[in-house]
Amino acid sequence: MSRHVAIVTDSTAYLPARAMERHGITAVPLTVVLGDRALEEGTEISTRSLAQALQKRRPVTTSRPNPELFAETYRRIAESGADGIVSLHLSAELSGTHDAAVVAAREAPVPVRVVDTGMIAMALGFCALAAAETAEAGGTVDEAVTAAEKRAAGTSAYFYVDTLDYLRRGGRIGAAQALFGSALAVKPLLQLEGGRIEPLEKVRTASKAIARLEEIAADRAGGAPVDIAVHHLAAPDRASALADRLRDRVPGLADLHVSEVGAVIGAHTGPGLLGVVVSSR
């Protein structure tokens, strides 16, 4: 009888629904707290509602899944026939999601390997896809974890935000950095480094910042085979145009995904976000 390894991630991977269905990946939702309402990302709050709330400066916070939600997910997957589970999550530097999964894994009916990928958005999504493809090929839990970790090591993520205010409010970047990024109309470029959102460059205007984001992503891709994801929040035209330019500039491009981030990431970046994830194959 063949073994079956199941892949779990969380809602901040922002994987296309068709990819999750095709590979049998389960995503556990994080929570967005809007005023006095706790809403599950992906099902109970739209990015449009989030953007409107942020623009009106309504209080918006986020929280990790309850460990019991992970426990229920692991039980359900085990009952469906899985012999082992690989649970891949956004950076533990940014969220307590990984810790909640670890708590639940201790009582799971099958072995669960919980992995802090150090990633976020499709940087996490590409790790989940790599693990799922390995599992589908008959790989063990350890082999699926290795595939995800290898993918993470070859993945970079870069972001443009209109302002650092939202990251500062959420504690994802230092107050001094946020103050500097807001001064003199500076437009910040950020990167995912060591599992944290760190400053990369400061550019004077939005158009120059987006052009520089494109240049950085194209240089990172080089000529080797890569997958790319372009993310945005309330900026679909900018994202589509950036994706088109990257198609022309990246000779080794395999797959390119364009998607709007969900409410959890959006709550910390604000409207106008553009992000590019470059992942080596």
From Swiss-Prot:
Gene3D superfamilies: 3.30.1180.10, 3.40.50.10170. Keywords: Lipid-binding. It holds the Pfam family DegV. InterPro entries: DegV, DegV_C, DegV_domain_contain. PROSITE patterns: DEGV. Residues 5-280 form the DegV domain. It comes from the Bacteria. The keyword Transmembrane helix does not apply. One of its GO terms (molecular function) is lipid binding. Hexadecanoate binds at residues 62, 95. NCBIfam families: DegV (TIGR00762). May bind long-chain fatty acids, such as palmitate, and may play a role in lipid transport or fatty acid metabolism. PANTHER family: DEGV DOMAIN-CONTAINING PROTEIN DR_1986-RELATED, FATTY ACID-BINDING PROTEIN TM_1468. This is DegV domain-containing protein SCO2569.
